[in-house]
Amino acid sequence: MQTDNKYRVNPFPSKREQNFSPREIILIRLDFPCEREGFCCFAHQSLTMTTDLSWLSRTQLLIGETALKRLASSHVCVVGLGGVGSYAAEFVARAGVGKMTIIDGDVVDPTNRNRQLPALATNHGESKASIMAERLRAINPELELHVISSFIRPEQVLDSIAETPSYLIDAIDSITPKITFIKTALERKIPLVSSMGAGAKLDPTRLQVVDIAETFNCPFAQQIRKQLKKRFGIRRGLKVVFSPEEPIKESLMLTDGTNFKKSAYGTISYLPAVFGAVCASVAIRDLKDEG
C-alpha cells in the first residue's frame, strides 16, 4: 500500500511492518536476518518485485554505500544523444543514478553508425531518444526516466523538466542552441559539464577537464567562447571536456545548415565515446562527493 510516497513493506512475518521510499528499498541494509532470501521491493508508478540488486555491488565496493545512495537519489539530465551524449547517458545509468532525463529530437542517420551508441543498420529513421530510453531501462528497470524526443528551444529545455536536475550534461553539437542552453543553466546555477568538439581528432589520451577560458586547439570551443562572451558576457565559470590535440583541418566538411550546423568534422569511432565517458565521470564524481 502506498502512503505519502512510502511503501509499507513486511516481507518478514516476525518483524514489524517497515516504511521505505523506493530508493531506500533499493539501498537499505537490513539489521535483522532475512527470512525470505532475495526478497526486495521497488516501485516506479506501482509496486513491483525484484530479486537481484547485485549489479551495483561492484560500484558500492568502490565508492561506498553513502556515495551510492547519493547517486541513487540524484537526477541527471543529458541533452543531446549523439556520439558523446549517448555514451554519457549509458555510463550515468550504469553508475546507479536513480533518475534521468534524456533529450534529443533527432533520428538515426546512416552516417551516425561510425560513432553513436543508438545507431544500427536496422534502425535508420528511428528516434535516438526512444532507442536510448529502451536501452537505459534494460540496464536498470527501476530507473525513473523522463524522455523528450522532440526538438525544443534551448532556453525552454529546463522548463520542460518537471523537477530541477541535480546535474546537467551538455552534449549539444550545434553552437546556437548550445550557448543558449549553457547561459540558461548558468543563470539557474545548476551544476553543468559541457562537451567541446570531438571531431578532427584521434588521441583519446589528451582529454582534459578545464574551465572554458583555458581551452585551446579546439575550433568548436573557440566559437563557444566567442559567442558566450559576445552575446551574454560570459567569459569563464563553465566546466568543459576538451582535447588540446591539434585538429586535422583537412577533415572539415561544409553542410547545408540543417539543425543549426553549417559544417562538420570527420570523426573516429572511439573518441566521442571517450568524451561521453569523461562527461559522465565529472557528473558522477561531483554527485557522489556532495554533502
Where are these regions (language model features)?
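N-terminal charged helix/coil linker that caps or initiates catalytic domains
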Residues: L47-C77, P110
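Cysteine-centered motifs
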Residues: C34, C40-C41
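Glycine-rich phosphate/adenylate-binding loop
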Residues: T50, A162-Y167, I172-P177, E187, ...
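Conserved S-adenosyl-L-methionine
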Residues: R94-K99
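Hydrophobic/small residue at the entry helix of a nucleotide-binding pocket
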Residues: V84
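Glycine-rich phosphate-binding loop and adjoining beta1-alpha1-beta2 segment
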Residues: D104-I139
